[in-house]
Curated annotation (Swiss-Prot):
Protein name: Protein FPV129
Family: Belongs to the chordopoxvirinae L2 family.
Compartmental location: Virion membrane; Host cytoplasm
TM region positions: 36-56, 71-91
Native organism: Fowlpox virus (strain NVSL) (FPV)
Keyword Transmembrane listed: yes
Length: 96
């Protein structure tokens, strides 16, 4: 009887350890996913600020000096950053 109870308790302990390992893995992945999303959101905000400043500066430069080449380069950069931000948004949504 004693060996049966010992074996049964050992089996219960093994199952509990597996469940705790699975729970730890799930929690770790959830925390990492949230940090990745937070990093993407902060990068999105920072890139949006930089892009808006680039657009404002390029418009100011166009009005002040009528420099069409600079405006073209800065607007091309802004469009490129918006495309990259959209692709990052798609990737972050596909992670969830």
């Amino acid at each position: 009887m004693h060996t049966f109870l010992t074996a049964r308790l050992q089996a219960i302990e093994d199952v509990s350890n597996r469940n705790l390992s699975m729970l730890e893995l799930i929690l770790t992945r959830a925390i990492v996913t949230h940090w990745i999303i937070l990093d993407l959101v902060l990068n999105l905000i920072f890139d949006s600020l930089i892009t808006s400043f680039v657009i404002i500066y390029s418009l100011y430069s166009f009005v002040a000096r009528n420099n069409k080449v600079l405006l073209f380069l800065l607007m091309s950069y802004a469009i490129f950053r918006f495309i990259v931000m959209y692709l990052l948004y798609i990737v972050s949504e596909s992670i969830d």
